[in-house]
Structures are given as structure tokens and as C-alpha cells.
From Swiss-Prot:
It is an enzyme of class 5 (isomerase). It comes from the Bacteria. The lineage of its organism: Bacteria, Bacillati, Mycoplasmatota, Mycoplasmoidales, Mycoplasmoidaceae. It catalyses: alpha-D-mannose 1-phosphate = D-mannose 6-phosphate. It comes from Mycoplasma pneumoniae (strain ATCC 29342 / M129 / Subtype 1). The gene is manB. Binds 1 Mg(2+) ion per subunit. This is Phosphomannomutase. The active site is at S149 (phosphoserine intermediate). PANTHER family: PHOSPHOGLUCOMUTASE 2B-RELATED, PHOSPHOMANNOMUTASE 45A. Keywords: Isomerase, Magnesium, Metal-binding, Phosphoprotein. Its cofactor is Mg(2+). PROSITE patterns: PGM_PMM (PS00710). Its EC number is 5.4.2.8. The keyword Isomerase applies.
Length: 554
């Protein structure tokens, strides 16, 4: 065990500000956990802020670490506005355990530093896209969101924004971290909040403005087929009240609520899985769909940025769960065909998203901007390009999208629900399914594509180091092909922890370390063939790579 980490753990055990329940947790920690949570390294930001297990220590999410991080964040935002004081911040939270406690600490730090804080009335759990919207709409200088998105219920997080409602980029968080004092000062910082600088928003006014602005982003808004039965689950998260209200506002009259999951619950009692990318997450929704004969289901993750849609496929007698790539492509194709753009249309997506969107953009006169993985990069790109161009869609392969550049700078499940239900109604009017629209109309025009993302969990608190070893192995491997597909080039993007195998015929495989979870993700982009054959090839490639890299099964 690292002796410094052990000594720091002892310091926490003897410190009067550390409560007895936290001391019990420290006492029960393994040597590996002590080394992780009590490391003297400064914290690091992932693709969506700082996330981690709620635990004592410099690298656990606790009242001390939130105060420490907030102090650095406020100093950074002040450095961008050196002559402005007080600054104005929005502070919000999701439905997770200790969220109210943690954002209370954040408020105390900000007000103790002489700045103004706005919160939602009653400290109401708030969707992440709405946080970004309010910062941008009301011209705040920044904002803090206490959320861990779809991470396990044991986790929490610290997500921060600039005055445009966009997440800070890596160079900005690097500057923020440089402003932080040594982590050993964490226990000695006692913020004294000033309630005179704390204000509350009128939630109903904010919701109305948001709904009105969202409605303006639709392509075609009429009353046809708004009685389509659609099952909805919000997984105990921040959308469970607002999303049904929003869809009712748009005129939808047959939204079927998965009631056990559509209540706030910090323990996520009726949702064992929180990521709509996982089919296991949909178990209860499938039961509701079966009982009501609904052919469409929607799932939204706990902080309401990720939206996913699934459709019953009568041919396979099973559900098809649309990926982020598939949803993003459908929105891009639909809007470019049916919307009149007043300025140059553009699409923003990431380096691991499907190449199909480039073909669509080229045919219909749009351009594509690709960013690093993480919506913080997408949001900042939209912020840049929206000045002279008009957004078609910004999307991630991991089921997140933004369909309007006028609202916010986050992936937005409300925007996604509105536009995807609009497309579903368009398909219903044509007598086709969403899947037929995607594989029939779009593939018929541009050829078949198969994009597949496979996450592999890496165990242990030192998971990042283990995965860095895997990436090194990939770049130094002597293999020339992957099950018959010649590798024409190996690209190593060290700064974003990504390795690419460029294959023949424009195909590729990419390997990336997740910035938010202990996972190595494999991305396959295959074309120039029929879908069934492409799927078969991807499966063989994956099996080969699992053996090569000695990975656990996904």
C-alpha cells in the first residue's frame, strides 16, 4: 500500500470534521480502495465532469470534495470575468442520494465567495438539458449540476458549465485543476454560506419557456396520429414528471407511463439498470407494452439527457432498440429532406459515430463537424458554428442528441422525444415502421451500414491504467488483418485515449477508454455489403479481438 495514502486515511480517521459514519467506511476499505480514494493526486475531469463513488477521501464524492471542486470552479469562472462581481450561477441536481446535501454545499461555497446563486424552487430535481437551457436563456455566468447521469446508484458527480450552457473543455478543466490547492487542504476548508445571495427560480415560468422554445424546433407540428400508444419510462429520474407534461403540451394523448419507475427515487428501487443503451433497462417497459399492445417504447436516463426509442418488429417478433447512430441518422435524413433551412445546414457528431451521416450530408448540402467523444465537445462546436449556420442535428452514438442550436448546449431527451415521435407519425402516415424507414428508405438510398458499439468492463479501481496497457498493446501489435480484413493503417490518438484500425473499403474499428465508466469500448463501422453479412463479419472481428486482448465478455 502507498504509505502516503495510508497516512492520509489515518488523518481522516482522526479529523473532527469527518463524521463517524464516514470513518466506519474508511475502516472497512481495502488497501486498493485506500490507495485510490486517498491518493494525493488532484482530481481529474472525464467526458462529463467528475464522477465517482459516494465515499470518504479526496477522490470520493463527499461534502469535502464538492466544496473543494466548487472553489476551483468559481475561481476559474472569475478568471474569465475578472472585473465582474458578483457572478451569477445556477445550481441544480438530479434525483440521486445526497444530491440535496451536495448542492447545498455547492451553494454555500459560491455564496461564501460573494457570488449569487439561483436554484430551482424547492430544490426540485432538474433535467440536465434544462440546466443548460436556463444558463443560456437567463445569461448566467455558469452552473453546477450535481449528477452522475446513468452511473450506478452508488455514484454521484460534479458537472460544470460556462455562460453559454456548454460544458467546459479539457484545456479549461486543466486550468481549473491548476488553480486548486493541494488536496490535503480539503478538510480545512469550511465555507460559510450567505443566504442573502441565494435566490429561487419560478419553476412553472421556466418550464413554460422551455416547452414553448422546444415546440419551435419541430419541423412539422400537426395533430395527425398523436394518439399513437407509446410506453415511457424515466427510470426514477428527472424526466418522470416533466416529459409527460411536455408531450401532453404537444398534443400527445396516449403516453403510457411505466408507473413504478416514473417516480423520484434516490435508491432507484424499481430500476436495476439505468442506461437505456442496455436492453435490461427496458424489462418493465416491455411488460407494459405487452399489456397495452403498444408498438413504441421510450426510455430516458436519470438526468434526462439520454433518450432511446424502441419499436416492435413483427418480422422477428422482438423489439428493435434504435442506437444513437440510427436515431441520429434518421433525424438528419428527415430534417434535410423536409425542413427549409435559412442558413447553411450542419451536423455535429463524434469521431466514433457512423460514416453514413457523411453520405447523407453530402447529398443534401450539409457539412459535418466531428469532435472528440463527449457532448462537451459537441456543445462547444455547436456554440461556434451556430453563429453563421443552422443545426440539423448534433448526436452521439451513445443515444444522445440535440436537434436545435437555439435552446441549449446539451444532449436533450425532450428535443429527441419530440423529433423522434414526429418521425414516427410521419412513418405511420406512410404506412411504414421506423425500422422500415431506416433500413428501407435510407439504406435504399445510401447502402447498408452496420455500426456496433461493444463495451467491456475493466475491474479494479486502477481500471484506467489497465486500459491504457490495452491501448498500448493495440498500437504495438504485429497483426496485419482482423479475420481477413486488411489493416491499412493504425492511428493512435493519445490525447483522447483512442486507437483506430483503418480497414479496407473505408471500414474501421476504434478502441476507446470511457471517460465516465471503467469500460473499454469497441466501435465497428462496416459498409459495402448487405446488413446480415456486415453483422456476421463484425461478430467474427469482435470474437477475435476479445481473444487477442484477453477481455472479459461484454
Amino acid at each position: 500500500m502507498n504509505s502516503n495514502a495510508y497516512l492520509e486515511a489515518q488523518r481522516w480517521l482522526s479529523h473532527p470534521r469527518v463524521k463517524p459514519n464516514l470513518k466506519e467506511v474508511i475502516t472497512a476499505m481495502s488497501a486498493e480502495e485506500i490507495e485510490h480514494f486517498f491518493s494525493l493526486k488532484k482530481p481529474s475531469f472525464g467526458t462529463a465532469g467528475v464522477r465517482g463513488k459516494m465515499a470518504p477521501g479526496y477522490h470520493g464524492m463527499n461534502v469535502f470534495s464538492y466544496a473543494y471542486l466548487t472553489q476551483g470552479y468559481v475561481n476559474y469562472i472569475q478568471s474569465l470575468n475578472p472585473t465582474k462581481k458578483p457572478l451569477r450561477f445556477l445550481v441544480a441536481r438530479d434525483t440521486r442520494k445526497h444530491g440535496a446535501l451536495f448542492n447545498g454545499i455547492v451553494c454555500d461555497v459560491i455564496t461564501s465567495m460573494g457570488h449569487v446563486v439561483y436554484m430551482f424552487d424547492n430544490n426540485e430535481p432538474t433535467p440536465t438539458p434544462l440546466v443548460s437551457y436556463v444558463i443560456k436563456k437567463y445569461h448566467f455566468d455558469g452552473g453546477v449540476n450535481v449528477t452522475a447521469s446513468h452511473n450506478p446508484k452508488t455514484d454521484n458527480g460534479f458537472k460544470i458549465y460556462d455562460g453559454h450552457g456548454a460544458q467546459l473543455l479539457d484545456f479549461q478543466t486543466d486550468q481549473l485543476i491548476a488553480m486548486l490547492p493541494p488536496v490535503v487542504t480539503m478538510l480545512d476548508f469550511e465555507p460559510r454560506g450567505n443566504n442573502e445571495l441565494l435566490h429561487f427560480l419560478d419553476n412553472e415560468v421556466v418550464y413554460k419557456n422551455y416547452f414553448d422554445d422546444l415546440k419551435e424546433s419541430l419541423v412539422v407540428d400537426n395533430d395527425s396520429f398523436k394518439n399513437l400508444p407509446v410506453v415511457f419510462t424515466g427510470l426514477h429520474g428527472t424526466s418522470v414528471k416533466l416529459l409527460p407534461r411536455f408531450l401532453t403540451y404537444l398534443g400527445y394523448s396516449n403516453i403510457i407511463s411505466v408507473q413504478p419507475q416514473n417516480v423520484f427515487d434516490a435508491n432507484f428501487a424499481n430500476a436495476d439498470h439505468l442506461n437505456p443503451e442496455s436492453k435490461d433497462t427496458w424489462e418493465l417497459a416491455r411488460q407494459y407494452a405487452s399489456n397495452t399492445k403498444a408498438k413504441l417504447m421510450m426510455a430516458i436516463d436519470p438526468d434526462a439527457d439520454r433518450f432511446a426509442i424502441a419499436e416492435w418488429n413483427p418480422q422477428t417478433q422482438d423489439w428493435h432498440y434504435f442506437s444513437g447512430n440510427e436515431s441520429g441518422v434518421m433525424v438528419a435524413y428527415y430534417k434535410l429532406k423536409h425542413k427549409q433551412f435559412k442558413r447553411q445546414p450542419y451536423i455535429v457528431t463524434t469521431v466514433v459515430s457512423t460514416d453514413l451521416v457523411d453520405k447523407i450530408a453530402k447529398k443534401y448540402g450539409a457539412f459535418v463537424k466531428r469532435t472528440n467523444v463527449g457532448f462537451k465537445f459537441i456543445g462547444q462546436a455547436v456554440n461556434h458554428f451556430s453563429k453563421d449556420n443552422e443545426l440539423v442535428v448534433a448526436f452521439e452514438e451513445a443515444i444522445g442528441m440535440m436537434a436545435s442550436d437555439g435552446l441549449n448546449r446539451e444532449k436533450d431527451s425532450f428535443q429527441a422525444a419530440a423529433i423522434m415521435l414526429e418521425i414516427a407519425r410521419y412513418c405511420h402516415n406512410k404506412g411504414i415502421s421506423l425500422l422500415e424507414f431506416y433500413r428501407g428508405e435510407i439504406f435504399g438510398e445510401f447502402g447498408d451500414y452496420y455500426n456496433w458499439t461493444v463495451p467491456h468492463t475493466i475491474h479494479g479501481v486502477n481500471w484506467k491504467e489497465k486500459m491504457e496497457q490495452v491501448l498500448h498493446q493495440l498500437t504495438t501489435a504485429t497483426i496485419k488483418e482482423v479475420v481477413g480484413h486488411k489493416i491499412t493503417k493504425i492511428k493512435n490518438y493519445v490525447d483522447i485515449n483512442l486507437v483506430e484500425y483503418v480497414l479496407e473499403n473505408g471500414n474501421w474499428i476504434k478502441f476507446r477508454i470511457s471517460g465516465t465508466e471503467p469500460k473499454l469500448k469497441l466501435y465497428f463501422n462496416l459498409s459495402n455489403g448487405y446488413l446480415a453479412a456486415l453483422k456476421h463479419e463484425a461478430k467474427k472481428m469482435h470474437e477475435f479481438l476479445v481473444r487477442l486482448l484477453n477481455l472479459d465478455k461484454a
